[in-house]
Amino acid sequence: MDLLEYMRSQNNMTQAEWERTFEEEAREILVLLAGGSGAGKRNGFWDVSHYFIAYVDCQTGALHTGDGRIVYPVSDEEHDAGGILDRFRREAVYRLKARKTIPHEIPEGMTASSQNQFLIVEVLEEDAPCPALEDVLAEYRRPVVVTDEVLGELTLDKDLDMFEGEVLWRGEQICLSLEVDAADEDTWADARRAMKVMLAEQDRWDGDMRASAARELTDLACEWRESADEEVPEITEESFARRIELRSIAMDADGSFSAYFDDDDMFFGHCVTAYGTLTDGVTAANIEG
């Protein structure tokens, strides 16, 4: 089963089917929440997730580190009422009674946290004391800064799994984001290496991204021009490519990238984004924001 088929099968589950993917017997755990949260629509209910970075099995006392999720279902009515992501606080320890997900084969592309989930049965305690998890939290809060000889100083945002910094691009400073797995230093090196490959040929990449965006979006920009309140200059592919201004690049560890350009008000302040990979070149361009 490929990733798309797997996701469709998951989204088609009823609540009863979804709950059967967890062990029948509940266990007591202490869990340290950190990172994001979200909710996904399934078949007749919403699956709410809050991410954790470690938990302790209260029966064995064993500490388990690594990304995971605590999850619970809510109805459409509860979702529409709002506030479903406010139930738990980040960087807090909770004592829970919960059912662990039953291990099963997942396709490539699924995150490790999808196999490390607990369905909440009962919240037993908030801000529960746990020295082991407090140590994990202290380490999590410790800033991680990497200094690269080409990319300069990069600061890790552990919640977003992203290094952030600035780099010189054709004589101008732009923002840089390296999208990584915060727990896997190999991805740190891969993302830095990929970005340096692009930087080494920045003149070619800059031209390719501008040309691709101009081919894809000039006609649309001309349509927007016609709706302007005041007279604006004619837009050609050449002028489009010249007018957009690169503001930031996001690079993945696998060499996939997104480049974000200022639109010079051709789309009334929307962002022009070019996408691609180091292997395939620029593959698409669109407006966002």
Question: PLM features: what roles do these ranges have?
Answer:
Residues 77-97:
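Short nucleic-acid-contacting surface segments enriched for D/E, G, S/T with interspersed K/R
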Residues 97-136:
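OB-fold/S1-family single-stranded nucleic acid-binding modules
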Residues 5-57:
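Structural detector for short beta-strands of small beta-barrel domains
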Residues 134-205:
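Contiguous hydrophobic, core-forming segments of folded domains
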Residues 237-289:
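C-terminal structured interaction module
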Residues 49-80:
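Short, structured beta-strand/loop micro-motifs enriched in basic residues and often containing a Trp
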Residues 31-34, 91-101:
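OB-fold and OB-like beta-barrel modules that bind single-stranded nucleic acids
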Residues 177-236, 240-243:
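Long, charge-rich alpha-helical interaction segments
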